[in-house]
Amino acid sequence: KELLDKGHHFSELSSGSTNQSELIALLISDKDDFVTGIENVFTKIKGSCSLLLLTENGIIAARDKWGRTPVIVAKKEGSYAVSSEPSSFPNLDFETVHDVGPGEIIQITADDMIRLRPATKEMPICSFLWVYSGYPTSEYDGVNVDTARYNNGMIMAEKDDIEADFVAGIPDSGTGMALGYAEGKGIPHRRAIVKYTPTWPRSFTPANQSVRDLVARMKLIPNRHLLSGKRVVFCDDSIVRGTQLSDNVSILYDYGAKE
């Protein structure tokens, strides 16, 4: 409403609502330069909003003021790259050189990286990166994803007093936790549920609940031979909407799991 009152016009829609990219672009263009424009975005947008802007003088990268979503800069001879997922760098021969801090704004050219706005100290980063959404080889602010998941499993095993025949993880992100649990508990790790990869990567992303249920059923295939008559610990981090959790419990019993 504030932008409309100033005479700005919205020409794009996304899923029947205001296009987020256009809204952010208008908030930036409402100020005199990119830095104050991005600061305007930080002030007006309540959620997390990290940005990459392609300008005539290079790329401007900005991490949201809370640091919830990562922005990582990598370098190789003669070029820079910016990504929210550092696992994209190694196979392209880039080396990570800088984790952009919360609220920090930098300008990148082929030859240099210039800080336009310093980072703030407060950073309630989203822990979901390490638990679920991050790629195992990635590191966010110096903490490796797979190591974090493995350590989570170790801690769970140390606090858990149940007896089980083996531990399994719901793939993919539950696998690292299951491996850590197996190490901490001293029991085998088995692949009692395997993911059928040519489906949706995330079962919580479809907007329709019936589609989410269908994807959940298609996505994971239990191994009856391993489950039958066994006491099994399952490490399942996929609890965004609970779609996988409710299905998995009933399926495990249907396939013969004892406990």
Report each predicted region and the residues it spans.
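Extended, hydrophobic alpha-helical segments in both membrane/secreted and soluble proteins
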Residues: 1, 167, 174-181, 185, ...
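Conserved short alpha-helical segments that host acidic/polar catalytic motifs at enzyme active sites
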Residues: 2-101, 107-164, 170
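Alpha-helix capping and helix-loop boundary segments enriched in small/acidic/polar residues
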Residues: 15, 143, 147, 207, ...
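A cytosolic small-molecule/anion-sensing beta-strand core signal
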Residues: 55, 228, 236
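Flexible loop/turn segments at secondary-structure boundaries
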Residues: 68-69, 89-90, 114, 174-178, ...
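Short acidic/polar active-site loop segments enriched in Thr and Asp
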Residues: 165, 258
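Short, glycine/charge-rich flexible loops or terminal/linker lids adjacent to PRPP-binding catalytic cores
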Residues: 186-233, 242-246
